[in-house]
């Protein structure tokens, strides 16, 4: 429960999307324990502020389907392997959260009894209300859908206030800022602008889903100091995507 000395929250329930690649840290593969522990501490701070936190993790640090696809492995098989990679990341994060005495539940779109709970919308909402972190794993459970789309879907289902996409850059740019020094960083974008400009925020399925349901997105640099705390208290960090420019 938030006490009177804590700042007023703009977002009470969030869905945080964290890429698998971000979990690698400076490595080329796997999970950097220091990144995992840092993420767990950031989440703990939000929970202690009274924020309800759901998460979706990517799996790109453990599995990339492109190489296997080029070798002849089918797309559906590759996508299923990617879903399992997200489960491995979810298990690692749950362990990191529990090491700092923060209760966490994993809910998987693919049943894996005895390891994680199956996804159940009403139970997920109950866990969130009880102060537990809920990690949604295995994407949507269907091939051809990205973890970005899964994040937006789960956010809508649980009634989150916003989807927060943590990246390695400080927002959305008109072009790759590493390749184009004239690239412009946007503070605000509409869903339509993202789609018409072909900006790499999320895949078009995820953007259209958010547009249809009025779910705002915020893209930010996870390495920015106190980024999550600043966002949930209403500070403009990174790029906000919504129906208009005054979300």
UniProtKB/Swiss-Prot annotation:
Inhibited by UTP. It is an enzyme of class 2 (transferase). ATP binds at residues 17-20, 60, 64, 167, 173, 176. It comes from the Bacteria. It catalyses: UMP + ATP = UDP + ADP. Its main location: cytoplasm. UMP binds at residues 59, 79, 140-147. It is found in: Cytoplasm. GO terms for cellular component: cytosol. Gene3D superfamilies: Acetylglutamate kinase-like. One of its GO terms (molecular function) is ATP binding. Pathway: Pyrimidine metabolism; CTP biosynthesis via de novo pathway; UDP from UMP (UMPK route): step 1/1. Its EC number is 2.7.4.22. GO terms for biological process: 'de novo' CTP biosynthetic process; UDP biosynthetic process. Keywords: ATP-binding, Cytoplasm, Kinase, Nucleotide-binding, Pyrimidine biosynthesis, Transferase. Signal peptide: none annotated. InterPro entries: AceGlu_kinase-like_sf, Asp/Glu/Uridylate_kinase, Uridylate_kinase, Uridylate_kinase_bac. Belongs to the UMP kinase family. Catalyzes the reversible phosphorylation of UMP to UDP. Homohexamer. This is Uridylate kinase. It comes from Legionella pneumophila (strain Paris). The lineage of its organism: Bacteria, Pseudomonadati, Pseudomonadota, Gammaproteobacteria, Legionellales. The gene is pyrH.
